[in-house]
Each structure stands twice: as C-alpha cells, then as structure tokens.
C-alpha cells in the first residue's frame, strides 16, 4: 500500500477499494457517502494510494443546526437548484449540491495527481441524494461494501490452509517428543476358567 500507516486505514475503505479494483477499470476512485465522506484511490498498478476523508452530508447538516443559533435542523432531500430561496433550501443546496461539487472537484484533482482519468464508483446510504447532481461519469453501487466483503471471503476461502509440521493441532496427552499419544481401546480381560 502506498500510505504512511497501513494499519490505520479503515477496513471499510479497504473493502470498497478491493472490490472496485477487481471489477472496474483502473485507476479507480471509490466514494462512500455515510457519516463521513471518504474517497479511496487505487492506481493503475493496483496500489492503494490513500484518499480523502471529510464530514458526511448528514454530519455537516446536523452540525449547522447544532452550532449555529439561527439555523434549523434540516431533513435531507434533493435540492431543486443551486440558489436557495429560503434558509432551509440554502442549507440543503450547500450540503447536497456542495457534496456533488466536492466529488467532481476532488476527483478532478485526483486525476491530475495520477496523470490519467479514473473510474468513479459511488456508494453509501446518502449517495442517492448526491449522485444525480454529479457531473463526473460515475457508477452508483449501493452494495459495494457487501460485495467487497463477499469477494474477500471467497478469496480467503480459496487459499490453501497451512498447518503445523505435525499436520495440525494435537489434542490429548503428549509423549516426551511432543507428539500426541495414540489412543487405544483397552484390552478385554478374559476370565480364565479353572482346569
């Protein structure tokens, strides 16, 4: 991976990226619209390069309602235009259309850094509000994470299992050489009849 701290990358981000890299032309950018909005970049050599993390759509709207005294809580929806004619419409446009513009602009910057066009795949619970407003060509796949988990499960299941030199785990008592003692059934004792 082409990142500074591979262990710190969110597993959901890696799963999204793994599925996209296996099923779409490279380079590929995945965008997951949830509590946070995350961008994940896989280059033409299948190297996970990192990405972008910013506040999610609903997180930003909720923060405006909580932190700004004059602004209400707004329910998510699709804005009809960029220019809002009241406070709620302005907030909706800024959040939903603003996220679409963020995606378009960020993918353009990513493509410039990669030096080539990228495939864009969008997923997440809030993507349905945003994807119709994006101008960059994209694929919307609401099941990207589930498909990624299924893919990784299949890949892991198809790998040969490696066992210890002794052929796996041994249960029961071990002899002085560390090998499991073979269990044998006790010998039947027969009663001798007197002669």
Predicted regions mapped to residue ranges:
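Gly/Ser/Thr-rich loops at beta-strand to alpha-helix junctions
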Residues: 35-37, 128
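Short beta-strand scaffold segments in enzyme catalytic cores
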Residues: 30, 37-42
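Nucleotide/phosphate-binding catalytic cleft detector across ATP-hydrolyzing
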Residues: 1-29, 44-195
């Amino acid at each position: 991976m082409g990142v500074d701290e591979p262990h710190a990358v969110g597993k959901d981000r890696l799963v999204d990226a793994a599925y996209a890299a296996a099923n779409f032309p490279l380079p590929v950018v995945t965008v997951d619209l949830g509590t946070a909005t995350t961008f994940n970049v896989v280059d033409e050599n299948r190297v996970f390069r990192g990405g972008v993390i910013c506040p999610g759509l609903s997180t930003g709207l909720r923060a405006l309602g909580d932190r700004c005294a004059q602004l209400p809580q707004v329910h998510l929806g699709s804005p009809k235009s960029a220019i809002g004619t009241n406070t709620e419409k302005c907030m909706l446009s800024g959040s939903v259309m603003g996220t679409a513009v963020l995606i378009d602009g960020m993918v353009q910057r990513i493509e410039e850094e990669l030096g080539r066009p990228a495939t864009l795949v969008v997923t997440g619970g809030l993507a349905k509000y945003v994807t119709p407003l994006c101008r960059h060509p994209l694929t919307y796949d609401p099941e990207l994470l589930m498909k990624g988990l299924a893919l990784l499960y299949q890949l892991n299941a198809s790998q040969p299992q490696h066992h210890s030199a002794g052929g796996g785990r041994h249960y029961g008592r071990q002899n002085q050489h560390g090998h499991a003692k073979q269990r044998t059934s006790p010998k039947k004792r027969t009663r001798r009849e007197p002669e």
